[in-house]
Amino acid sequence: MLPIKEFQILNRIAALHHRSLPTYLTYARPWVKVGSEDRAAIIDDIAADHHDLVERILRVLEAEDRPIALGDFPMAYTDLNDLSLDFILQELTHYERRLLHTLEDIATWVDRDSDAFLLVNMAIGLAVGHLENLAEANGDSPAMKT
């Protein structure tokens, strides 16, 4: 049986990724200028990684037969509806940076010999990769070339 602390930590990580900004943006697409569709694909890629991580964590949590709470999207996300891809990619960079800091903090609470530690570190690795991809996508932005 998973210790309650680790269960709560994994539930928090699953919730952070299940109701993440990239996931929200798969439902409320930003405005994309013609020719920038390839840059917009990064949103779907990040959201897919978040979904896969949540699925992996849920397999562990569901075996515990305890209630799982993933929550709702934050209402603040609606402020980003219909904004440009350039702006959204910058917001996603800030979001992923905050997520990375949160995950690094959470990693300090977890026993290094646990499954939770492996999943937290997987989430950290994903966040680092997402930040690299976002930096590249933001570098391709016409707004960043002025």
Model region roles, listed by residue range:
Residues M1-A47:
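N-terminal leader/targeting helix
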Residues I9-L16, S20-Y27, T78-L126, H130:
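Acidic/histidine-rich alpha-helical segments that form the ligand environment
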Residues E37-G71, N133-P142:
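Conserved alpha-helical segments that form or flank metal/cofactor-binding pockets of metalloenzymes
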Residues E55-H94:
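Carboxylate-rich helix-loop segments that flank metal/cofactor sites and access channels
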